[in-house]
C-alpha cells in the first residue's frame, strides 16, 4: 500500500491514468504547475473513483533545488492530507505552506510566482540589450547591479547564464528551466487572470518575449535564452 503518491506531470490524461493504475493510495499529491480548473478536474476523477484524497501542491524551484531538497511547496486541500505529507515535504523542500482548502489557492499562488520569475528574467534581458545598444559595458553594468539592493539569487543566476549563452554563439544548452515551460506557465497565468478579471498587461508583454525566444529556436534551451529575444542585430 502506497500511503502517498506524488505526481509531477504536465497533461491531464496521464495524471488520471496514473491515479487509476495505483489503487490503494491514501493521498494523491499533484505537484505540477497547472491551472486551477485542471487541478479540480484531476481531483474530481481521483475522489470520484475513491482512488485517494487529493492534495494540490505545486512546487517552486529548479533542478538544483530539487536535488538539494530546497523546493518551496504550496499546498491546498484538507489539513489532514497536508499533515500526512509533511514528512515527505520536509525531505523535498525548504518550506511548505497550506495555502487554503481549494485547489486554486495553491495553483494561483504558483502562477503569481511564475509571473514574478518570468518578468524578472525578461526585464534583465531587456536591460542587458539596452546596455549593448547604448554602448554600455554589459558586464560592468551587471557588476553594479550585483552590488546593489536590486540583485537577488534569481537575477544573479539567470544573468550569468545569459552571458555564457551569448559567449556560446547564443546557445543555451545547459538547461535549468526550459524556455517553453516558462512560456507555458505565463500563458496559464494570463488565462487565469482573464477568468478572474485581472489586468496583467506586463505579463502579456513578457509572454510575447518568450514566444519570440521559442520561435528563434530556444524553446528547449534554458530560459536565459530570453536574452536573444531582445536582439535583432546579432544571432
Q: What does each model-found stretch correspond to?
A:
Residues 4, 8, 15-16, 46, ...:
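Alpha-helix boundary/capping residues
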Residues 21-26:
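Short acidic/histidine-rich motifs immediately flanking catalytic phosphotransfer sites
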Residues 105-233:
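Helical "substrate-binding/catalytic lid" subdomain
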